């Protein structure tokens, strides 16, 4: 997490907790000529547009007061989507038994993507079941992105 994301987390946590939402992720990224501060929130039953607006307005006010971002940027508050990232230990507990996708920094046996059922997070290793008889333990430092797999 970079400095802006960390400051944003400190500013938004009281807003999210007051509404009993879950803070899923924060990203500060440059895309083309623009910079985006993206905040992903969730709650049981899903986030509504009104929920996003409420959090966006509260965070925008706090960001204006603290002024941690010097350059121009767009603030976006949304749900994490169907392919939400799994980053915190609580995410791995919450989605145990779900299909996930690991994107690796470097290919292993010619593969940079592994998909399987999340067994858990054990000793900082992501454990997934890739077949009825095979489980894989992948150290988190080898994984660039862990996210829920979209099922069609």
From Swiss-Prot:
Q: Where in the cell is it found?
A: Cytoplasm
Q: Which residues form a coiled coil?
A: none
GO CC annotation = cytosol
Q: InterPro entries, per this entry?
A: Ribosome_maturation_RimP, RimP_C, RimP_C_sf, RimP_N, RimP_N_sf
- Enumerate the Gene Ontology biological process terms: ribosomal small subunit assembly; translation
Pfam entry (one): DUF150_C
Keywords (A to Z) from UniProt: Cytoplasm, Ribosome biogenesis
Superkingdom of origin organism: Bacteria
According to its UniProt entry, the function of this protein is described as:
Required for maturation of 30S ribosomal subunits.
**Similarity comment: family membership:** Belongs to the RimP family.
Q: Matching HAMAP family, A to Z? A: RimP
* The protein's name in its UniProt record: Ribosome maturation factor RimP
Species per Swiss-Prot/TrEMBL record: Alkaliphilus metalliredigens (strain QYMF)
